[in-house]
Amino acid sequence: DTVTAISFDYGQKHRIELERVESLVDYINSTFEKPIEVNGETVYATIRYRQIKLDGLSSLLNSALVTGGDEVPEGHYAEENMKATVVPNRNKIFASIVQAIALSIAEKTGEQCDIAMGIHAGDHAIYPDCRQEFRDADDHAFRLGNWGSEKVGYFTPYLEGDKFTILQDGEVLCEE
């Protein structure tokens, strides 16, 4: 199986994820050169990485998280304090691009193509696009708007988890 990891450079101020993702993919690929058992199935982990640059987007968005935006609020992660960090429609933008890529792959190969988004519950209160309701509506719009969309699976495995849950899963996988 081949996994394509995708990150987006949309002019975000916090760059560490973009800086570290390539070395993480290299680490995973070198660690899992041999097959591993996942849910009773033998899997060869091959990960390709693509960074998609959304040049110019940050200048059009009103958010403290993008270059040219206000200062990122400090202090308690309270709803009112952190609303300035909402990047309008960010997860929809990402999902639309990833859905289009997955559908293109499915059409080209004739095989099912699954996507998994890292949207997580820790952000529900502040970011409306981190909720099950949003994910379901997004999936519905994708299915209505595309022929062959049944060939694309859409997973949000951390929608009920937080960043700590993601970290724990990563640690468990690295131990295996």
Question: Model segments located where?
Answer:
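Nucleotide-activated chemistry modules centered on ATP-dependent adenylation/adenylyltransferase
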Residues: 1-176
